[in-house]
């Protein structure tokens, strides 16, 4: 393995850990504020955390590459907004652990999108991974009465949006300055979230102050740090390769939900999670076999 690839893999693994535990912060936030308020505020914090990086990079050659970055950031920001919105609203109705595994389905969706856009042939590993992930999601989310929980449906839609976002970032990461692209997409997400929050939700300062720590983690770490590292890490890692590492996000979400929120998975749900993780890995490891 090339040293650059190893470095990128390590960076993306760190991103997966940050995002996995971010499900806990997001779930705690839902006890006090609306989903769009939480997202809007944490993306504002994420933008602020990026400003010092941009300032110190102002004289570097890559920092002067601005042509087209606004358009690129708006496109990636819209898909990021859709994904994070479906996920955050879904967390009102489901657990952090379940949301982590369902969100992780985007690693199965990415190869299918690549097949669609590039007209690649569907590999056996992709089909096996999709089947395992589908069975796993059925066990995890569908009740004994064959009803799928509303929150799980919303989180599944977020997985589709994140799959598009991953592919878009994979194509843009080598063309633009990492911090600036991250700032633009986060700013787009913050503005859209706050606009929706002003229409449908109520701002209560005392409730916002109660979640200062989850907001700081969700804003500075999950947004400012993680999304910047994602863009930087994907410079030497293709989207399908990055998706393998990001599949571990669901494992860290389950660990965080169990350790911090005392969430417990039933035997049926645990089997579903195991099948989903296996499907995610198989779909990527045997994608080009």
List the predicted regions and their residue ranges.
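Specific transmembrane alpha-helical segments of multi-pass solute transporters/efflux pumps
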Residues: 22-23, 51-103, 139, 219-237
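Helix-helix packing/entry segments at the starts of transmembrane helices
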Residues: 39-41, 99-105, 169-191, 223-259
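Transmembrane alpha-helical segments that form core, pore/gating elements
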Residues: 46-50, 110-112, 116, 147-201, ...
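Hydrophobic/small/kink-forming positions within alpha-helical transmembrane segments
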Residues: 20, 24, 51, 77, ...
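C-terminal-most transmembrane helix of multi-pass membrane proteins
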Residues: 43, 51, 55, 211-213, ...
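Glycine-/small-residue-enriched transmembrane alpha-helix faces in small-molecule transporters
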Residues: 1-37, 78, 86, 144-171, ...
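Hydrophobic transmembrane alpha-helices of multi-pass small-molecule transport proteins
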Residues: 50, 122-142, 160-162, 191-193, ...
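Specific alpha-helical transmembrane segments that line the substrate/conduction pathway
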Residues: 37-48, 88-119, 124, 158, ...
């Amino acid at each position: 393995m090339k040293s650059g690839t190893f470095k990128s893999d390590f960076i993306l693994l760190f991103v997966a850990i940050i995002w996995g535990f971010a499900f806990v912060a997001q779930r705690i936030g839902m006890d006090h504020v609306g989903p769009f308020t939480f997202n809007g505020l944490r993306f504002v914090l994420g933008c602020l955390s990026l400003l010092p990086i941009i300032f110190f990079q102002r004289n570097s050659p890559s920092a002067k590459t601005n042509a087209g970055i606004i358009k690129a950031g708006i496109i990636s920001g819209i898909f990021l907004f859709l994904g994070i919105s479906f996920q955050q609203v879904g967390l009102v109705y489901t657990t952090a652990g379940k949301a982590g595994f369902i969100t992780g389905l985007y690693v199965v969706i990415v190869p299918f999108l690549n097949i669609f856009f590039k007209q690649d042939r569907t590999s056996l590993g992709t089909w096996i991974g999709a089947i395992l992930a589908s069975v796993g999601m059925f066990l995890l989310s569908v009740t004994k009465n064959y009803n799928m929980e509303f929150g799980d449906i919303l989180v599944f839609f977020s997985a589709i949006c994140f799959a598009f976002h991953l592919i878009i970032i994979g194509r843009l990461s080598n063309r633009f300055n990492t911090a600036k692209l991250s700032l633009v997409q986060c700013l787009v997400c913050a503005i859209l979230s706050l606009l929706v929050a002003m229409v449908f939700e109520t701002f209560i300062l005392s409730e916002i102050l109660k979640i200062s720590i989850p907001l700081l983690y969700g804003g500075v770490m999950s947004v400012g740090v993680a999304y910047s590292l994602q863009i930087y890490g994907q410079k030497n890692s293709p989207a399908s390769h990055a998706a393998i590492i990001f599949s571990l996000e669901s494992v860290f979400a389950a660990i965080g939900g169990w350790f911090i929120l005392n969430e417990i998975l039933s035997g049926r749900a645990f089997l579903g999670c195991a099948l989903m993780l296996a499907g995610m890995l198989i779909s990527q490891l045997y994608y080009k076999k």
